[in-house]
Amino acid sequence: TVKAQDVALKTNLLGWATTSLNAGVEIGTAEKQTVQLFATINPWKFSGDKKVRFWNVEPEYRWWTCQRFGGSFFGLHALAGEYNIKNVDLPFGLLPKTKRGRHYEGWYIGAGVTYGYQWLMSRHWNMEASLGVGYAYSPYKLYGRCARCLDKNHRNYVGPTKAALSMIYIF
């Protein structure tokens, strides 16, 4: 049965800073173990013909060094999603630089390792910082004006796969 300190709801404040809607749930599975499922979506089109639309799901297993929902943890995460990006250059070489009027559509799947720390703020509220690095495979299509496909290619990405500063409510 699920008891107190076994379930947490969370949101990544860094995601909100980029206008990305996001939420996650984390469930205690043992004294020092939790599993988390996190989802993010950004459905917006911005001014100046810029677009960064995507969705992402990220399951993660966590092992806590002391007790769950407090202190340091190490994790293994997976990630998968789709994107549609126009007139925006992404950091870390995620995609080749875009020229005006061109956009990328594709999907990705990957995995990585995480380190994080969770601070106890009050009986029900915590704050968490985490960073993950890993690998992602991403096939994509590059489109030009009038939706003409200019290129089909893929990226093998190695680098940061996760960054979070999360506000957490623990039941």
Language model region names:
Residues 9-16:
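Short strand-turn segments of transmembrane beta-barrel domains in outer membranes
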Residues 19-22:
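Short, surface-exposed coil-to-beta transition loops
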